[in-house]
Amino acid sequence: MARYIGPTCKLSRREGTDLQLKSGSRALESKCKVETVPGVHGARRGRLSEYGLQLREKQKVRRMYGILEKQFRNYYKSAARLKGATGENLLQLLESRLDNVVYRAGFGSTRAEARQLVGHKGILVNGATVNIPSYQVKAGDVVSIREKAKKQLRVQSALELSKGRAPIHWIEVDSTKLEATYKALPERADLSAEINENLIVELYSK
C-alpha cells in the first residue's frame, strides 16, 4: 500500500477528530471541519457496528502516526509478544519511533515533516546520523539536529510553534543545543485519551 499524499484535512474529517497532521499554526477548526465527513455536503456519520468502531479506531491511530497497514500490523504483533497490556505496548512502540520523537521534541511541526527531516539525514541519535523514521529510540538516547539542518526554515518554524505546546515529561529538550533526551517510555496516562487501543486489540484478536 502506498503512503497517502492527499489532503490531510480529509483524513481528520474521516476520523472525526484532529489527527495532528497539520502544523498547528492556525486553529484546526479554521482549516478543517472535522465534524463533517468528506464527500457529500452535509452528510452525517452513520451508526457503526462493533467491527466498524474497531476498524475506525485502528485507521485513526495508523493515520495519526503515519504508518502503513503492514507496518501497523507488525507493530501489533511485536506489542503482543511483550509483557504487559498489548494496547499500551503498541502505543509505546509507536511513540518510540524516531520520527515521532523528533515531532514530540518540537523539531518538526508535524510527524510527516519530522519523517522528512529524518529521511533527509537531518537527525542524529547519540551523535550518529540515523535516516530511518521507524528506528526505535531507547531510554537514554539523545536525539539532536545536525548543524546544517538547524538553519532550515521549516526547523526554525517548528521550534517556534513548539513553544506553545504543553511540555512532555518523558522527553527532555535542550532548546539551546537543540537536542532531546528520551528519558523513558511514556505511561498510558501521558498519551491521548481520545485513543481507545482496546478496540484495536479486539480487532486484531479476531
UniProtKB/Swiss-Prot annotation:
SUPFAM superfamilies: Alpha-L RNA-binding motif. GO terms for molecular function: rRNA binding; structural constituent of ribosome. InterPro entries: Ribosomal_uS4 (IPR022801), Ribosomal_uS4_bac-type (IPR005709), Ribosomal_uS4_CS (IPR018079), Ribosomal_uS4_N (IPR001912), S4_RNA-bd (IPR002942), S4_RNA-bd_sf (IPR036986). NCBIfam families: PRK05327.1, rpsD_bact. One of the primary rRNA binding proteins, it binds directly to 16S rRNA where it nucleates assembly of the body of the 30S subunit. With S5 and S12 plays an important role in translational accuracy. Belongs to the universal ribosomal protein uS4 family. Part of the 30S ribosomal subunit. Contacts protein S5. The interaction surface between S4 and S5 is involved in control of translational fidelity. This is Small ribosomal subunit protein uS4. The lineage of its organism: Bacteria, Pseudomonadati, Pseudomonadota, Gammaproteobacteria, Oceanospirillales.
